[in-house]
Amino acid sequence: MRLRKKWWARPEIEASDKFAEEPKELRGKWNKEFNNNNDIHLELGCGRGGFISQLVEKNKDINYVGIDLKDEVIVYAIRKVKEKEEEVKREFKNIKFVTMNIMGIAEVFDKNEISKIYINFCNPWPKERHNKRRLTHTKLLTEYKKFLKPNTEIWFKTDDKELFEDSQEYFKESGFNIEYITYDLHNSDFKENIKTEYETKFETMGMKIMFLKARLL
């Protein structure tokens, strides 16, 4: 579904200190932007921020960058973080949001700058001619490797079985070792899961969620 253009979104996100307006200028300088030397984790396709806002609250010693394509999405992610701040009565200084096409992500982060990636319910791009747009495709995994630290983990969740099984091959072909995998996350022994908005919706529909952790060798 195509989002309706919200002309008010850009001014609102630019007014927020949670928004990185010129991310390419921060390449190699993200820790300076956060004013600390803590690890930096990415969520690719952060949507409306339900997942990353929980991470930010739970892990104040980790920096987070949430990336999505549209201002119309990021504006709600920023609002979600603000809501969480008001709920816990604490300002989160460990979160930044970026609007960009993830295909150009290596222009935004430098070598060894990122310690973890989360990919949740990304577009499965089922048509073969579109497969290279998948966020887990070897083409993009090669780009991620340009800025990932050694032994970095990528956590991947989806409800799409074809994407999940193809992604296992993508990770293996790209030099990652799959350390944990389940085809039914909510009935697995994995205890560190944080649910996204989509995930909660899918759970009420009785859909199984697939999950894997892949580590860069």
Curated annotation (Swiss-Prot):
PANTHER family from the UniProt entry: 3-DEOXY-D-MANNO-OCTULOSONIC-ACID TRANSFERASE/TRNA GUANINE-N 7 - -METHYLTRANSFERASE, PENTACOTRIPEPTIDE-REPEAT REGION OF PRORP DOMAIN-CONTAINING PROTEIN
EC number: 2.1.1.33
HAMAP family documented for this protein: tRNA_methyltr_TrmB
UniProt KW keywords: Methyltransferase, S-adenosyl-L-methionine, Transferase, tRNA processing
Name of this chain's protein: tRNA (guanine-N(7)-)-methyltransferase
UniProt keyword Methyltransferase, yes or no: yes
Listed GO CC annotations: tRNA methyltransferase complex
Family: Belongs to the class I-like SAM-binding methyltransferase superfamily. TrmB family.
UniProt binding sites for S-adenosyl-L-methionine: 43, 68, 101, 123
Catalytic activity: guanosine(46) in tRNA + S-adenosyl-L-methionine = N(7)-methylguanosine(46) in tRNA + S-adenosyl-L-homocysteine
Protein purpose: Catalyzes the formation of N(7)-methylguanine at position 46 (m7G46) in tRNA.
PROSITE patterns linked to this entry: SAM_MT_TRMB (PS51625)
GO MF annotation terms: tRNA (guanine(46)-N7)-methyltransferase activity
GO terms (BP aspect): RNA (guanine-N7)-methylation; tRNA methylation
Gene: trmB
NCBIfam families assigned: PRK00121.2-2 (NF001080), tRNA (guanosine(46)-N7)-methyltransferase TrmB (TIGR00091)
InterPro entries: SAM-dependent_MTases_sf (IPR029063), tRNA_(Gua-N-7)_MeTrfase_Trmb (IPR003358), tRNA_methyltr_TrmB_bact (IPR055361)
Protein's UniProt keywords contain S-adenosyl-L-methionine: yes
Enzyme class, spelled out: transferase
Pathway the protein takes part in: tRNA modification; N(7)-methylguanine-tRNA biosynthesis
Binding site for substrate: 127, 159, 196-199
Region (Interaction with RNA) location: 129-134
